[in-house]
Amino acid sequence: MSIEQTYKDIKSLKIQGASNISDSAIKEIKILVKNSTAKKPHLLTEEIESSIERLKSARPTEPETENYLNYINYFSKRVVTQKISELKKEIIKEINNIE
């Protein structure tokens, strides 16, 4: 899937239930991080933030998803590194901890 497809599936109620919505959104952010071609950490965090905002807008009344995505966004901005590979590794590790 993709961020956009997951957004559409959540919005159209194809994906329902708090846990299913959270799981799908988190999975897509993880895939985004793994596959990102961003060359600098700040570009990756911008990409994450943009994607998170898109996913949250699909079902704004879903607090569980919003909380998880906000945490991932917060965490991604707090990792101090100049290496994109280290940032990706830390974010994926943190996502694995909450999955």
What are these regions (language model features)?
Residues 91-99:
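Active-site pocket-lining segments that scaffold enzyme catalytic pockets across diverse folds
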Residues 1-88:
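Long amphipathic alpha-helical segments
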